[in-house]
């Protein structure tokens, strides 16, 4: 059932590519294939226009069905939506970038991505999609194997996606400041966005300031902190106070008459950072989308930022992948 509070809209931020991107979207990570089509459809009815997907999430076909249903019913047009997907590491070789993008477009049932992102700054050994898809980090029980493709070659192929109108904007995810500095030295088309883990336990202030100063819009994933990682038996998440239950967050929620989740999302969006939460609860869908209609005080912003512990939950070695991407 769709939300009882439909037709909300999120403000947009301007990308350096010239396109506008909603500052609040719907993230598809860990959305079950069985419910994905309905969740996307209901999110569109609620007012969501940005959907953040990826090859690695394994639910792009289902997400596309939700989009197609909403378009068929006249709720939205394709041009009203901002659809994001990501290039997985097994497809970093320039000869595989365009086929990967076209495959994902076909799964969504669309002709172009509004934003196509390099998911991780590391190439993995190529896996034929006919053999395993999504390829994930490795086959079950095996170690991940790195590829032999430097990022500048991958980025050149990403730029060609823009040339061929398969992607309107291109971006990066999980990149360090050093990698961004290097990329900006050779990029013909600059990345429009940087997507990173960002919440009060991991503020990454230096990285965010550098990216924003260079004209990249920052998108935060895992805005609620440990919440999404508990079911993955992530030790860092299970041993930490949930941000939704933290006294600092709850105090602001009570003051503003909002939910703790809305406070966490507003802490990001008020600082110009896009967010991509998800929910299958109609009321929470609307609440998350409505997380820009109030302002936190400067003191509240500082108090929330002061919760920083440098605590990263999405760290490949923590789930058995032998690549210390973040050191």
Swiss-Prot record:
Superkingdom per UniProt: Eukaryota
One Gene Ontology biological process: D-xylose catabolic process
Active site positions, chain numbering: 57 (proton donor)
Record's keyword annotation contains Lipoprotein: no
Functional pathway: Carbohydrate metabolism; D-xylose degradation
Residues where substrate binds: 119
Binding site for NAD(+): 173-174, 222-231, 278-288
Gene Ontology MF terms: D-xylose reductase (NADPH) activity
Annotated family: Belongs to the aldo/keto reductase family.
Purpose of the protein: Catalyzes the initial reaction in the xylose utilization pathway by reducing D-xylose into xylitol. Xylose is a major component of hemicelluloses such as xylan. Most fungi utilize D-xylose via three enzymatic reactions, xylose reductase (XR), xylitol dehydrogenase (XDH), and xylulokinase, to form xylulose 5-phosphate, which enters pentose phosphate pathway.
Protein name from the UniProt record: Probable NAD(P)H-dependent D-xylose reductase xyl1
GN (gene name): xyl1
